[in-house]
């Protein structure tokens, strides 16, 4: 994200503006959620509204940039778990990490929705939702093969569950509450004896 659309590196001042916008956006989204004023973000970053909109043409694009590193880390964790852990516990561990991250980062829950739901449409390949589908899909597939999860449970079901818990607990922001709810819900996705 530090290159222009032509692939050339950003000028030093443009790179500084980009970083200031991301820093301000992270703070404002943490305080006010995904519906925070873009004008307030530009003001806190010390840039004009046009500068913000030139670099981030939509709210979704700005949210994606703010949360991308964390989502990539969660995707890396999913890939590592597919290689090292038992399928059922691996899936549970990843969903718990995803829930904790989502609850502690206001605004992220909306970004986890498929493009066009909750925020303006975006390129599906460019969304956190698509990244998580790719990473979590393998964990779920392994859990299905191992019989650790009911066959009718989809990744969309699990991401919707994480999203609903995150949105429901966003006001108190307590990851323990969200984790407790997730564990209760996950007990329902295990196969019946």
Predicted regions and their residues:
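Short, basic, alpha-helical segments at the C-terminal edge of helix-turn-helix-like DNA-binding modules
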Residues: 68-75
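Amphipathic alpha-helical segments that line or abut small-molecule/effector binding pockets
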Residues: 23, 72, 88-103, 179-183, ...
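Short hydrophobic/aromatic patch on the recognition helix
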Residues: 46-56
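Short linear capping/connector segments at secondary-structure termini
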Residues: 110-120
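Basic, helix-initiating cap at the start of DNA-binding domains
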Residues: 1-43, 61-64
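C-terminal peripheral helix-coil segments that are non-catalytic and often amphipathic
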Residues: 1-5, 134, 138-146, 168-193
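All-alpha amphipathic helical-bundle segments outside canonical DNA-binding/catalytic cores
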Residues: 124-128, 145-160, 171-177
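Hydrophobic alpha-helical connector segments
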Residues: 65, 79-104, 121-124
């Amino acid at each position: 994200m530090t290159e222009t659309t032509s692939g050339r590196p950003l000028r030093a001042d443009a790179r500084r503006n980009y970083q200031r916008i991301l820093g301000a956006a992270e703070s404002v989204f943490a305080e006010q959620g995904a519906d925070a004023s873009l004008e307030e973000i530009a003001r806190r970053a010390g840039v004009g509204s046009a500068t913000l909109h030139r670099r981030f043409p939509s709210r979704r694009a700005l949210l994606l940039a703010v949360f991308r590193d964390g989502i990539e880390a969660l995707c890396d964790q999913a890939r590592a778990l597919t290689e090292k852990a038992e399928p059922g516990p691996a899936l549970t561990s990843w969903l718990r990490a995803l829930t904790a991250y989502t609850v502690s980062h206001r605004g992220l829950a909306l970004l986890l929705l498929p493009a066009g739901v909750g925020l303006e449409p975006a390129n599906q390949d460019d969304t956190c939702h698509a990244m998580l589908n790719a990473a979590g899909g393998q964990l779920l597939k392994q859990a299905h093969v191992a019989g650790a999860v009911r066959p009718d449970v989809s990744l969309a079901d699990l991401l919707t569950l994480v999203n609903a818990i995150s949105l429901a607990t966003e006001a108190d922001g307590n990851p323990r509450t969200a984790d407790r709810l997730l564990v209760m819900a996950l007990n329902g996705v295990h196969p019946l004896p």
